[in-house]
Amino acid sequence: MSGPLPAQERVLPTLNADGSRRRIHPRLYKGRLYTARLITAWGLIALFVGLPFLHINGKPALLLDVTGREFSFFGRTFLATDGMLLMLLMITIFLSVIWLTALVGRAWCGWGCPQTVYMEFVFRPIERLFEGGRADQIKLDKQGLSLRRALKYPAFLLLSILVANVFLAYFVGVERLWQWMQKSPAEHPVGFLVMGVTAALVMFDFAYFREQMCTVVCPYARLQSVLLDDRSLIVGYDKQRGEPRSKGKAKPGEDAGDCIDCNACVVTCPTGIDIREGLQLECITCTQCIDACNSIMHKIGKPPGLIRYGSQTSLETGARTRIARPRAFIYPALIGVFASALVFFLMRGQSADVMLLRGIGAPYVVQGDGIRNQLRVKIENRSP
């Protein structure tokens, strides 16, 4: 019986031609952009861990109290009845994401997304510590599960539990979380279950699923064809300068571009794509290919920038990108409208909510001189 037919068209970078999973083991190139991303990533991690401990006006800076139906956001408390305010806040954030994507592309994916931050700057370095570099990891793939590879999983599990507990603190607060950690899980089974499920999902994601979260699951990547245009900032390959390619340094008089087809940009990509094929859904603009290519250009005596930040227009024509265009002004105008409405409703909000409720028991009592109604008054402080 014959085997499966090879694919006649391009398959996903994370798949082999027969449809099996292709494990991605990117080679690390440390350059100027990697250093900037490293500083940014650890700053965001510090913010994620430290934000639940920050209190403003006696409340956590960010708390999503689902059971209490309260949302604390930097000193302001939103209730379930504040539907208008929450809607305006969400629309403002949503439009801001669209506007930034139109200007700087998927910079969020490569620089700020938790998937990239934790994968490339926490879990991947630990993996390299236990397994070695790209070549060693490929050898371990052929050997199957080994002691060297198995040792990383306890470290992954410990980190996953830590991330899950910090995540839980955003919903219950650090004070209650600390109380739970000092007691038996049987006394707070729901909280323990949420932490356990979150830790399991984090472990599954960073130990196995990895880049497929970006290329298969994440809807943001699917929207780039709508949110980007030919003037949006992307990471791209300069074909005019790089083509035609040559193996090794070009000889004097040879008609060859600067690209020496070393595949450094391919083996360093965390999603496994070849950036020279143009803008692709799987590209998260992490700039690893820029650092890799610049290091090769330095070795062969060529100027950097064969792979660089730019727009599709600038990469194809060499012309300078003009940022000014309708969407660059329409989105900020809409953001200004909704943000102004949010500020307006926040400023005119009352310092207290007074609610008249029906009393417990009989709604009224008949007395000799008249009828006495049973009522309850609920006064809720809304001042900061």
Predicted regions, residues:
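Hydrophobic alpha-helical transmembrane segments in integral membrane proteins
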Residues: 340-363
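Short solvent-exposed strand-capping/beta-turn motif centered on an Asx-Ser/Thr pair
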Residues: 380-384
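Cysteine-centered iron-sulfur cluster-binding motifs in ferredoxin-type domains/subunits
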Residues: 101-116, 206-221, 249-297
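Composition- and surface-driven signal marking solvent-exposed, interaction-prone regions
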Residues: 280-284, 295-312, 345-346, 357
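Short, solvent-exposed loop/turn segments enriched in Ser/Thr/Gly
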Residues: 370-376
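Membrane-embedded alpha-helical bundles of multi-pass integral membrane proteins
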Residues: 1-244, 290, 303-336
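Short, solvent-exposed beta-strand/turn "edge" segments of beta-rich domains on protein surfaces
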Residues: 363-370
